[in-house]
Swiss-Prot record:
Record's cofactor remark: Binds 1 [4Fe-4S] cluster.
Chief location bin: nucleus
Protein name: Exonuclease V
One matching Pfam family: Exo5
Name of the coding gene: Exo5
Species of provenance: Mus musculus
Family recorded in the similarity comment: Belongs to the EXO5 family.
Length: 373
């Protein structure tokens, strides 16, 4: 049975969207851009019935059945995932799946959260440095900007400075993950601390279920960052998963931005080699402390701060479970009965197969026989 406090606040919190960090905002905007540019497989609208042959409606069940031959990574044309993809699975995996299969417009409430998050994000950035807009034309340009940001931040971290929006990437349990760390700085004890700022619409701390998602997020950031500075992330893995063309010339805006930063390169391959060499020789430490800070959006009042204990085995176990879905090794799962309060404000509550089956997926989601290499 769900706790009374959770039920009372479900209307405001059950979407899992009531708080947003700068890093999540950046990843969310990247995801929205990817959705707009990606080629879809007859992507359906927000209704439970889809146009079929002769414009006759096809049920969501039959539409899904036709896609089961593909893994979710193949079905959604994904080369890699964002950390926030796995964090959304931590809240409700089925909600995440419906969000990708039945994309729709943001509700006014969620749009307002994004607008506020964008404003706070901008203010935090301007505290450290001026913002520079670099026009990009290709995915190679986009990755080049990530690499240039890393090259600019490494010296700051070496001198025990503070940086924001540190890009992280690496292969975890067979899936390539990309993310953005909100902030890295050193404590008075000289320890490297990851700080994740969460802005809250309401002046209350999040529910335990939301905190669990936040704990997983910062732990996963640490796991990937540590692998990067310890030389465990390789250029071969990056190229294999992202399918980047290393010999492709970078755009003039990117090259100009690189020169202004004292970096002379012509292609992404040159820049990537420089980044991996810099990470290897930087002697940056692993992250020592994980901190979550919750503040009220309207008043900027600090609601609470939490230090998160990093449990590597638990992180890897969760990632393995979530990755199994993306690889097509298992079906998506909804929430446990104890957390059914999350469904109250879910956009897909009326078509959710998990709810219809009382926690058991209907026939449209039953596992299909697949051959694994």
């Amino acid at each position: 049975m769900a706790e009374t406090g959770e039920e009372e606040t479900a209307s405001a919190e059950a979407s899992g969207f009531s708080d947003l960090s700068d890093s999540e905002l950046v990843e969310f905007l990247d995801l929205e851009e990817a959705k707009e540019s990606a080629v879809s497989l007859s992507k359906p609208g927000p209704s439970a019935e889809l146009p079929g042959k002769d414009d006759k409606p096809v049920s969501l069940q039959n539409w899904k059945g036709g896609l089961d031959v593909l893994s979710p990574m193949e079905r959604f044309h994904l080369k890699y995932l964002y950390v926030t993809d796995l964090c959304t699975q931590n809240w409700c995996e089925l909600q995440m799946v419906y969000g990708k299969e039945l994309p729709g417009s943001l509700t006014p409430e969620k749009a307002a959260v994004l607008d506020t998050g964008a404003s706070i994000h901008l203010a935090k950035e301007l505290e450290l440095h001026d913002l520079v807009t670099v026009p990009i034309a290709t995915k190679e340009d986009a990755w080049a900007v990530k690499f240039l940001n890393i090259l600019a931040m490494i010296p700051a971290l070496q001198s025990e400075g503070r940086v924001r929006e540190f890009p992280v990437f690496g292969e975890v349990e067979g899936i390539f993950l990309v993310g953005v760390i909100d902030e890295l700085h050193y404590t008075s004890k000289g320890e490297l601390e990851l700080a994740e700022l969460k802005t809250r619409r309401r002046p209350v701390l999040p529910l335990p279920a939301q905190k669990k998602k936040d704990y997983f997020q910062v732990s996963l950031y640490k796991y990937i960052f540590d692998a990067m500075v310890q030389g465990k992330v390789t250029p071969a893995s990056l190229i294999h998963h992202t399918k980047l063309c290393l010999d492709k010339p970078l755009g003039p805006s990117v090259l100009r931005h690189a020169r202004q930063g004292g970096v002379s390169v012509k292609s992404l391959g040159d820049l990537m080699e420089l980044v991996f060499l810099s990470l290897t020789l930087s002697d940056l430490p692993a992250i020592d402390t994980l901190k979550l800070e919750y503040i009220h959006q309207e008043t900027a009042t600090i609601l609470g701060t939490e230090i998160v204990a990093f449990e590597e085995k638990e992180v890897k176990s969760k990632v393995q479970h979530y990755v199994a879905y993306w690889m097509g090794h298992r079906d998506p799962q909804g929430v446990d009965v104890e957390e059914a309060w999350k469904c109250r404000t879910c956009d897909y509550v009326d078509i959710c197969e998990w709810r219809r089956g009382s926690g058991v997926l209907s026939s449209s989601w039953e596992p299909k026989a697949k051959k694994f290499k």
